[in-house]
């Protein structure tokens, strides 16, 4: 490029030395040389530099669009999963509440059954004890009635100091 500038500069100096007057409205050769160089550089950049950059930008835009679509899809899946989770938790809470209420009812029933059995056992034990005490009382009463004579004679002999056993035994 340095040579082209030198040539353009030399041509402009030669034109001035030749005595020509330059009109700024009429383009000279330098303008066309610079224009040609600009167009060549523009064509090279447009042909070799811009298409790969545009390709990379399009790929980036496609990747960003895909990422946005994936994010949207993920958000929808998360919302659906959250809704399923909330529904499952609500159902589980209802089921747990039902099981808890059933367990409480069963517990009350078991306690009531145990209480009824205990009351029956107590009543049965009291009845058995009452019957046993009655039998023992009757047995003791019969025993006492059978031995009342000998016991009274022994007691009287202890109190009086006289042996009444022989006379009581004869009776």
Curated annotation (Swiss-Prot):
Keywords: ATP synthesis, Cell membrane, CF(0), Hydrogen ion transport, Ion transport, Membrane, Transmembrane, Transmembrane helix, Transport
Superkingdom assignment: Bacteria
Gene3D superfamilies for this protein: F1F0 ATP synthase subunit B, membrane domain
Keyword Metal-binding assigned: no
Main location: membrane
UniProt cross-references to CDD domains, sorted A to Z: ATP-synt_Fo_b
GO molecular function, one term: proton-transporting ATP synthase activity, rotational mechanism
Record flagged with keyword Cell membrane: yes
A GO-annotated cellular component: peptidoglycan-based cell wall
Localization annotation: Cell membrane
Membrane topology according to the record: Single-pass membrane protein
Coiled coil: none
Transmembrane regions listed in the UniProt entry: 31-51
Recorded family membership: Belongs to the ATPase B chain family.
Subunit structure of this chain's protein: F-type ATPases have 2 components, F(1) - the catalytic core - and F(0) - the membrane proton channel. F(1) has five subunits: alpha(3), beta(3), gamma(1), delta(1), epsilon(1). F(0) has three main subunits: a(1), b(2) and c(10-14). The alpha and beta chains form an alternating ring which encloses part of the gamma chain. F(1) is attached to F(0) by a central stalk formed by the gamma and epsilon chains, while a peripheral stalk is formed by the delta and b chains.
Functional summary from the UniProt entry: F(1)F(0) ATP synthase produces ATP from ADP in the presence of a proton or sodium gradient. F-type ATPases consist of two structural domains, F(1) containing the extramembraneous catalytic core and F(0) containing the membrane proton channel, linked together by a central stalk and a peripheral stalk. During catalysis, ATP synthesis in the catalytic domain of F(1) is coupled via a rotary mechanism of the central stalk subunits to proton translocation. Component of the F(0) channel, it forms part of the peripheral stalk, linking F(1) to F(0).
Designated name of the protein: ATP synthase subunit b
Lineage: Bacteria, Bacillati, Actinomycetota, Actinomycetes, Mycobacteriales
Name of the encoding gene: atpF
């Amino acid at each position: 490029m340095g040579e082209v500038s030198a040539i353009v500069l030399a041509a402009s100096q030669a034109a001035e030395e030749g005595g020509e007057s330059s009109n700024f409205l009429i383009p000279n050769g330098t303008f066309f040389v610079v224009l040609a160089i600009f167009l060549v550089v523009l064509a090279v950049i447009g042909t070799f530099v811009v298409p790969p950059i545009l390709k990379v930008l399009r790929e980036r835009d496609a990747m960003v669009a895909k990422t946005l679509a994936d994010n949207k899809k993920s958000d929808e899946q998360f919302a659906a999963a959250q809704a399923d989770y909330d529904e499952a938790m609500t159902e589980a809470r209802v089921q747990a509440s039902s099981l808890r209420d059933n367990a409480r009812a069963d517990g009350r029933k078991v306690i009531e059954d145990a209480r009824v059995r205990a009351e029956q056992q107590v009543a049965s034990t009291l009845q058995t004890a009452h019957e046993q005490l009655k039998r023992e009382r009757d047995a003791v009463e019969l025993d006492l009635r059978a031995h009342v004579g000998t016991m009274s004679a022994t007691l009287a002999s202890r109190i009086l100091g006289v042996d009444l056993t022989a006379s009581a035994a004869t009776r």
